[in-house]
Amino acid sequence: MAAGFARSRQGIATVASLDQGVWAKTQADFGCHDFRDTDAGSMLRVKGSDTLAPVGPGVVTGWDFRNKGIRTLVNGIAKQDSTTAEMEWDMHYLVADIARTITLVPGDLLFSGTPAFSRPVQPGDIVEVEVEGLGRLTNHIVVGPTPIRTDVGAQPTESEEVISTAMGGDWEFRGIRTPSKDLYPSTVEEKE
């Protein structure tokens, strides 16, 4: 999910964080986790690369963020199925926490992240994110129009540790604790 702001917010209480002047959108939380080793401790390239933060299909005002269903489908199969009640920090808390030190201005978007059980996707996949009351956002995964340059900077990597971390493993135990594929079921049905 994404919260957007029609007026500035700074140093506000949690209870007032999502009062008037806030709107909501469905948001897909993509990441290019091949850059986790490149940006160790940072998510700049992992989450900030072009096209990784699609939002839509429209803007909803007066929407209550509490206890709403969130589902992610990949090629029509549910991969994530949760509610906002299961979020570690709800959107009210996230807005108030960020606004302690960063002034949120009109047009800013704050993303809540994704439910547990992230899954890798490949070119050709169709990813749909549904948020109760906000609608469905559909994304077609494609190869980017420009290859990543190899003559400058650290290059993307892929390893079991990177994949484990991307799917919810503990960063501080990378390379120490062997990743267990049993902890990361590939579908919602497998975890039940």
Regions found by a protein language model. Name each.
Residues 12-24:
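N-terminal accessory regions of nucleic-acid-interacting proteins
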Residues 23-26, 126:
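A short, gly/pro- and small-residue-rich
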Residues 33-192:
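Catalytic-pocket segment enriched in acidic/His residues
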